Amino acid sequence: MSIQDIVETYSTKWYVVVLVALIVYKVFDFFYARYLMYKLGAKPFLQSQTDGYLGFRVPFELMGKKSEGTLIDFTYQRTLELDNPDIPTFTFPIFSVLIISTLEPDNIKAILATQFNDFSLGTRHSHFAPLLGDGIFTLDGAGWKHSRSMLRPQFAREQVSHVKLLEPHMQVFFKHIRKHHGQTFDIQELFFRLTVDSATEFLFGESVESLRDESIGMLNDALDFDGKAGFADAFNYSQNYLASRALMQQMYWILNGKKFKECNAKVHKFADYYVEKALELTPDQLEKQDGYVFLYELVKQTRDRQVLRDQLLNILVAGRDTTAGLLSFVFFELARTPRVANKLREEIEDKFGLGQDARVEEISFESLKSCEYLKAVLNECLRLYPSVPQNFRVATRNTTLPRGGGKDGLSPVLVRKGQTVMYSVYAAHRNKQIYGEDALEFRPERWFEPETKKLGWAFLPFNGGPRICLGQQFALTEASYVTVRLLQEFSHLTMDPNTEYSPKKMSHLTMSLFDGANIQMY
């Protein structure tokens, strides 16, 4: 058969052309990657994982684990199943695209700080924009810098130190606990209501008062506008949906259902109500407002409705969810660890008194910071249960990470432009090389040991680098105040000894307990 006959025979076989083109592309890409490694001083990855299906099974497997409450521990377990778990940087495919996963502190430091400009949020804006728009958590570059400069003054010490604003909400919270008369109840559900009440008061100038309901003989007349109904449920649904979109990476657009759009609209209507109220105020009226209101301060900087709504919703996610999740894990662990609860109660008694002798007026931003064991308890919960357990960045250029390559795994590895790097704070915080053989145990005393004074990038409860959480002091102050007040007010804290441990975790944009924190408190 002549060459002309071969060409005529196969010229109409389009799939042959596609196959040849694919082979040529793969060969070229292989050698180009080798060239980049040589140019940047990188070595091949020591370890990789595959599902045998070019990564098409992975995202659906992850979403299945998410719906079961086992996603976080499943991804952590994958790092333990590496041929060499001591070199915790590897690749795995999602939809045939290689993803890099790491929990190596030097690599995380590079991503978040020393090579900050080499990485961006990638597709996060597309994942989250339907709910959160253009806010500090969804933007990169100049937009992010502008958002941060706008929001930073709102988290100055004088704003985060106003703990007395929490006390009216705590009094309602106590009523909910007492109505159970020592029986088991889910305190996590109450924490989410408490933090949305306090967050909306801080952000909007008035609380949604979600804790006030008929079960404790209190009517909620705070929400008297159209758009109030179902706000919390809509917010929860949309956040859960966003987490699923993030797991799909570049295929996020598959998840864009009708209910998701309806819930986003409800949340936006809720925020728009407060934005319009604030915009109706004149500059003189804004200056004369009593107390501090986050929204009013933003209105002094911009009158753009979209900007105001987006920034408020971004901060509401952080202000409500991170603190509620942290408090839930704190009381879950205190209830199952009486030794720690008793030791913490002793410190609180010494500092502020208990029960009828409680000196609530002495609880302040400054006095809370002097509670060393309380600080250790919070740190230990943030170590075992970081609010954002997993995150990712996307390379903006061809670059490297310091560890994971070569025969010993200690050489730099190549990160291609557009490649996703996932990092697990949850797994890094459980690294036995760093935290010892008891790394999986809840032991606050470790925070008084010399080793924990020099953790650096091995402890990242609030992220790190230029994008470190602006509201970390706000969250810690609120969590500290609530913990102190609850232990002052109630002397008994227990849990069913048959409660599953380690608990299942809910993974939305932040982490919480999948089955709630079911305790007895009286």
Curated annotation (Swiss-Prot):
It is a single-pass membrane protein. CDD domains: CYP52 (cd11063). Heme binds at C469. The chain crosses the membrane at residues 14-33. It is found in: Membrane. One of its GO terms (cellular component) is membrane. Its EC number is 1.14.14.-. Signal peptide: none annotated. Induction: By various alkanes. Its main location: membrane. Keywords: Heme, Iron, Membrane, Metal-binding, Monooxygenase, Oxidoreductase, Transmembrane, Transmembrane helix. Pfam families: p450 (PF00067). One of its GO terms (molecular function) is iron ion binding. Its cofactor is heme. Belongs to the cytochrome P450 family. Together with an NADPH cytochrome P450 the enzyme system catalyzes the terminal hydroxylation as the first step in the assimilation of alkanes and fatty acids. Preferentially hydroxylates hexadecane. This is Cytochrome P450 52A2. The lineage of its organism: Eukaryota, Fungi, Dikarya, Ascomycota, Saccharomycotina. The gene is CYP52A2.
